[in-house]
């Protein structure tokens, strides 16, 4: 498969997301697709705009987004997570290009993050591949 994708990474949990990016890159290599561009954004709220810009490009055929939305002391993360995921779904439909969701949470407790890094990263790329066939 000869497709080019972009990856949007949330930098709030940079060290964890850098590891996710490594696994996503490995999965892209395994699947025979190319990561054409990586965009780092401050957090989850900026992911939809970065995805929109990526998917507007003719050379990008899909995208993956990687990040973490932790459980906080208020409902802020949950509300934000729902809004971001809704926007991501809408962007897939508008651009007719697949987006793989590799955002852990919302509501992830610290002990849940580590075990989910690799599976979420690989699954995000896998979803783009599956929907590109």
Protein language model regions, located:
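A charged, well-structured terminal subsegment
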Residues: 118-133
């Amino acid at each position: 498969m000869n497709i080019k994708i972009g990856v949007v990474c949330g930098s709030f949990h940079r060290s964890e997301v850098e590891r996710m990016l490594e696994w996503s890159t490995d999965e892209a290599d395994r699947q025979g697709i190319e990561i054409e561009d990586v965009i780092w954004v401050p957090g989850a709220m900026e992911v939809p705009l970065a995805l929109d810009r990526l998917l507007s490009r003719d050379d990008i055929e899909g995208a993956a987004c990687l990040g973490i939305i932790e459980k906080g002391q208020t409902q802020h993360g949950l509300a934000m997570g729902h809004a971001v995921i809704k926007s991501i779904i809408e962007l897939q439909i508008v651009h007719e290009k697949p987006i793989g969701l590799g955002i852990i949470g919302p509501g992830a407790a610290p002990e849940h993050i580590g075990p989910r890094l690799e599976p979420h990263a690989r699954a995000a790329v896998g979803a783009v591949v599956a929907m590109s066939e």
